């Protein structure tokens, strides 16, 4: 599975590490993805990768 939220589409961002000598090297910032069980509209339960913001705002419907 990819490093992408299935609800909002949040993906890794590219930027630079900057040292005290102002040397720059590329790096990635990853979203805080969690594997959670999600119940879709048909009632089927499946595992999805969702960012913590989508979990907090209620986009992920957890089964009872």
From Swiss-Prot:
The keyword Ribonucleoprotein applies. Coiled coil: none annotated. Transmembrane segments: none annotated. Keywords: Ribonucleoprotein, Ribosomal protein. InterPro entries: Bacterial_rp_bL28 (IPR050096), Ribosomal_bL28 (IPR026569), Ribosomal_bL28/bL31-like_sf (IPR034704), Ribosomal_bL28_bact-type (IPR001383), Ribosomal_bL28_sf (IPR037147). The keyword Ribonucleoprotein applies. GO terms for cellular component: ribonucleoprotein complex; ribosome. Pfam families: Ribosomal_L28. One of its GO terms (molecular function) is structural constituent of ribosome. HAMAP family: Ribosomal_bL28. Belongs to the bacterial ribosomal protein bL28 family. This is Large ribosomal subunit protein bL28. The lineage of its organism: Bacteria, Pseudomonadati, Thermodesulfobacteriota, Syntrophobacteria, Syntrophobacterales.
């Amino acid at each position: 599975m990819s490093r992408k939220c299935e609800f909002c589409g949040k993906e890794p961002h590219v930027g630079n590490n900057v040292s005290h000598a102002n040397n720059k090297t590329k790096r990635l910032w990853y979203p805080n993805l969690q594997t959670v069980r999600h119940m879709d509209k048909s009632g089927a339960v499946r595992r999805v990768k969702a960012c913590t913001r989508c979990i907090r705002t209620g986009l992920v419907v957890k089964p009872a």
